[in-house]
Amino acid sequence: MKYNKKFMLEAIRVANENIQNQGGPFGAVIVKDGEIIAASGNSVTTDNDPTAHAEVNTIRKACKKLGTFNLEGCEIYSSCEPCPMCLSAIYWAHIDKLYYATTKDDAASIGFDDSFIYHELTLQPHQRRVHAEQHDRDIALEPFNIWRDKTDKTEY
């Protein structure tokens, strides 16, 4: 896998087009074996879905198209450095390589500042802005134990 400018230009084209369709200024494409498998822009406001970032939307499309949740062998080209949520999704999807154009600082300069999330992740759950409390661990371990012992599970 080697960087190919034509795929980045497509991600940027999707970002530009997305702005015209009431979306945010972000686009992404997923490539496998030199072919675009999926492309999408950010649709947070049009879908009323705060998780509908370009990378997540593109991962969802690629998984549906390929019929798998595992995107090993794929690359993702993003018009911007992914936010923490999208970066996590890239890892969970097992994408092999990430290429991005603009940086998280570039995004922050136009109002998309994720630095507070990076900071929040360094804090203990009870110190975060969204205060978290743990309850009923003993009861909630039951499904974990069932999963651990399940012999016909599909691991991911």
Where are each of the predicted segments found?
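Short secondary-structure boundary/capping segments
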Residues: A28, G67-T68, T122-Q124
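Short, basic and Ser/Thr-rich N-terminal targeting/leader segments
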Residues: Q22-F26, E72
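Residues at secondary-structure transition points
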Residues: K2, G24-P25, T45-H53, E81, ...
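Zinc-dependent deaminase
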Residues: M1-I19, P82, A89-Y156
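Small-residue (primarily alanine) positions within well-ordered alpha-helices
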Residues: A11, A15-N18, A28, A38, ...
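Helix-adjacent hinge/juxtasegments
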Residues: A52, V56-A93
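Short beta->alpha transition motifs characteristic of CBS
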Residues: I37-V44
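Short beta-strand scaffold segments in enzyme catalytic cores
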Residues: F26-G34
